[in-house]
């Protein structure tokens, strides 16, 4: 789970957004949230400072010659704040679905951030369909990893979705497209 190394994001995850919001803005918010969670994990920067830094200097800004996409700032804040607030609930749920002998604190930091953010959305953002949560975070994993990590993200979020939102999966399996 940790041996494939990172690659720079080469593509944007495909986003879908309810309420007429730009799918790209939600996708950009998810990417920024994963980056912020990673930064907090690696540097120990606190929640208030990382959110302020991202909102002032990254979301929709040009950084080192790269243009950051406009992100839905409120959605970004909700994910980052929510992961921090719900981490004691999220981590054991993710741990339960990792391969035997693995714990969340042993996986790669970016993968850990992706899993936490995806689990938060699956648990707390019922306005976002589970299939969208899974697709978005699998696409994010593909942007950072070339190995098995996207499959890990897919498997864990799918299991969480079946546990937390069984009605969505029951509807999907009953004669739909």
Where are these regions (language model features)?
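N-terminal interaction/assembly modules
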Residues: 1-177
């Amino acid at each position: 789970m940790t041996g494939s190394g990172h690659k720079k994001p080469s593509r944007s995850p495909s986003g879908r957004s309810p309420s007429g919001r730009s799918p790209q803005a939600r996708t950009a918010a998810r990417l920024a949230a994963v980056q912020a969670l990673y930064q907090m994990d690696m540097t120990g920067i606190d929640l208030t400072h990382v959110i302020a830094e991202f909102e002032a200097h990254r979301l929709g800004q040009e950084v080192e010659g790269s243009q950051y996409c406009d992100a839905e700032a409120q959605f970004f804040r909700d994910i980052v704040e929510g992961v921090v607030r719900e981490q004691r609930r999220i981590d054991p749920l993710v741990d339960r679905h990792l391969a035997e002998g693995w714990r969340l604190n042993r996986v790669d930091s970016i993968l850990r951030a992706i899993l936490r953010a995806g689990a938060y959305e699956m648990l707390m953002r019922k306005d976002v369909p589970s299939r969208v949560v899974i697709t978005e975070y699998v696409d994010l994993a593909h942007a950072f990893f070339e190995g098995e990590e996207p499959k890990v993200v897919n498997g864990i979020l799918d299991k969480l979705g079946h546990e937390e939102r069984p009605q969505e999966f029951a509807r999907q399996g009953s004669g739909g497209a």
